[in-house]
Amino acid sequence: FENKVPEKQKLFQEDNGIPVHLKG
């Protein structure tokens, strides 16, 4: 899972500047 975090994190951060996986 963590291997995909950096890739998904880049896309999620664009939502509100906050990673969606951290927002829940």
From Swiss-Prot:
Pathway: Energy metabolism; oxidative phosphorylation. Gene3D superfamilies: Cytochrome c oxidase, subunit VIIa. Residues 1-13 have a biased composition (Basic and acidic residues). Keywords: Acetylation, Membrane, Mitochondrion, Mitochondrion inner membrane, Oxidoreductase, Transmembrane, Transmembrane helix. GO terms for cellular component: mitochondrial inner membrane; respiratory chain complex IV. It is a single-pass membrane protein. It is found in: Mitochondrion inner membrane. Its main location: mitochondrion. GO terms for molecular function: oxidoreductase activity. The modification N6-acetyllysine is found at K10. Residues 1-24 are annotated as: Disordered. GO terms for biological process: mitochondrial electron transport, cytochrome c to oxygen. Belongs to the cytochrome c oxidase VIIa family. Component of the cytochrome c oxidase (complex IV, CIV), a multisubunit enzyme composed of 14 subunits. The complex is composed of a catalytic core of 3 subunits MT-CO1, MT-CO2 and MT-CO3, encoded in the mitochondrial DNA, and 11 supernumerary subunits COX4I, COX5A, COX5B, COX6A, COX6B, COX6C, COX7A, COX7B, COX7C, COX8 and NDUFA4, which are encoded in the nuclear genome. Component of the cytochrome c oxidase, the last enzyme in the mitochondrial electron transport chain which drives oxidative phosphorylation. The respiratory chain contains 3 multisubunit complexes succinate dehydrogenase (complex II, CII), ubiquinol-cytochrome c oxidoreductase (cytochrome b-c1 complex, complex III, CIII) and cytochrome c oxidase (complex IV, CIV), that cooperate to transfer electrons derived from NADH and succinate to molecular oxygen, creating an electrochemical gradient over the inner membrane that drives transmembrane transport and the ATP synthase. This is Cytochrome c oxidase subunit 7A2, mitochondrial. It comes from Ovis aries.
